[in-house]
Amino acid sequence: MSLKDRFDKFIEYFTEDGDDVQVAESRVQQQAVKPSNSRPAQQEPVRDIKQPRLVSSSSQHVTNTPSSNENITRLHARQQELAQNHSVATSEKVTIDVRYPKKYEDAPAIVDLLLANESVLIDFQYMTEVQARRCIDYLDGAKQVLMGNLRRVSGTMYLLTPVNVVVNIEDIKLPDGVHSEFDFDMKRR
């Protein structure tokens, strides 16, 4: 399988029904923007051009790693602080936000609620299956970074909770054949 085919399949994963036209238009625009006044005498072989790019990208990766680790450390400290404040003030009522996302762009708002240490019940009944899978994929990534939990409640509903919330899934009576573990496959309902 060629590299181009892999990129096409990767892009196809993120495209939806109406996005195919936009992707084709963006490819045409990118080709039109490329400068055409390069001189053949100054062109270097392809091997020489690729090597400096690999070196520069690896050096950028090394410089970005400490800042990302610093961000994760600060985020973890903030979550611990919120967890301690929450355990001290146990008399407060706990609320669970219920969200009905209609498009993939609603996912960052749900992650913002998780970042604010709130539990969210998400019902994907108004989304297509492709959009719902993409949204679940996005939420799973956020869950991993924020150390939260993502549990399946029913065929189209998922419960996203912060690290300090414990969900006893046995109390939720699921019908036979429905698993509570996270799964990208929404076809199994």
Curated annotation (Swiss-Prot):
Cell division protein that is part of the divisome complex and is recruited early to the Z-ring. Probably stimulates Z-ring formation, perhaps through the cross-linking of FtsZ protofilaments. Its function overlaps with FtsA. Its main location: cytoplasm. It comes from the Bacteria. Homodimer. Interacts with FtsZ. Residues 27-41, 54-70 have a biased composition (Polar residues). This is Cell division protein SepF. One of its GO terms (cellular component) is cytoplasm. Residues 25-70 are annotated as: Disordered. Belongs to the SepF family. It is found in: Cytoplasm. One of its GO terms (biological process) is FtsZ-dependent cytokinesis. Keywords: Cell cycle, Cell division, Cytoplasm, Septation. It comes from Streptococcus gordonii (strain Challis / ATCC 35105 / BCRC 15272 / CH1 / DL1 / V288). Gene3D superfamilies: SepF-like protein (3.30.110.150). PANTHER family: CELL DIVISION PROTEIN SEPF (PTHR35798:SF1).
